[in-house]
Structure formats: C-alpha cells, structure tokens
Amino acid sequence: SELGADIRMISKSTYEIDTSRINCTEVSNELSRQMRASYYFLGALLGRFGSAQVAMPGGCNLGPRPIDQHLKAFTALGADDSVEYGMIRVKADHLQGAHIFFDTVSVGATMNAMLAAVMAEGQTILENVAREPHVVDLANCLKRMGADVHGAGTDVIKIRGVKSMH
C-alpha cells in the first residue's frame, strides 16, 4: 500500500495486513480524496505514532462529514488538533485514557476514538457511542491484535490501553 503496509490475500474473504513497515504519519491528499473515510487513519496513526495528518475525506457525495466529535475524542485523549487548508492534523506527546461522552452518536468518531484509545495509557470510557455491527467487528479485530476492549455493541465502550499490539 502507499503507506507501506504489505497486504496479502489469504482467501476470498480473508486478508493478512502487515503494518510493521509503516513509518509515515501523513496520508497524501491524493489517497485521502479517493476514500470516503480517510479520517480513520487519524486514530490509527495517532495511537501508533503520536501524530497524523490526513486530508479531509472524499470519495462520494453522501454529504458533509463533520469531524468535530472525532477531534473532541482526540483532544480528550491529550492530542492537539488543527484543520487548515483541507488538512486535519493531530499530535500528542502522550495519549492518556479519558472519559468521553459523544454529543451525537457517530460511527466514525466511535471507531476513530477506539483506534487511538487502544494505545493510550490507562482506561478510556466512551459513552453515547455507535452500536453498529462494524463497531463490534472493529472491537473484535482490535482484541485479536492484543487490545483490551469491552462493551462494543452497547452505548458504553471501555478500553484499557496497551503498550503494543500485533
């Protein structure tokens, strides 16, 4: 992939993704504009590297994609954020678990907060979260990778940060 991940198809419905070679925290404008949800890179890269830069999402005409709840979660975890010239930037010297209540239910903000919080120190409690099946799928995937996530599928998700994942 453009970021440096190795992707291998194991079967028709199973892929193996090796991210050990990723060392980049910026997702290019070109790549971001091809995806409807490029902002998911923010939580994953912030959690892993402490910073991320991603262009505003593109990819389809479903309407505006507000990111205020995403940024609220990142800020609560200890990150600084800025949005300038169509680029979203987040940076943290140290991610710390937090209690986050989302003002509105958002699948994207829920998943992005989960992606960052799994690497934060301490416990994160996410309230008023999305309950969609893909939120549960992400929680299950993160657990298989070594994360400590409970409550996906309910309106409260509890995450205890880990030092590393596989």
Cite the ranges covered by each PLM segment.
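Structural preference for solvent-exposed beta-strand-turn elements
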Residues: 1-166
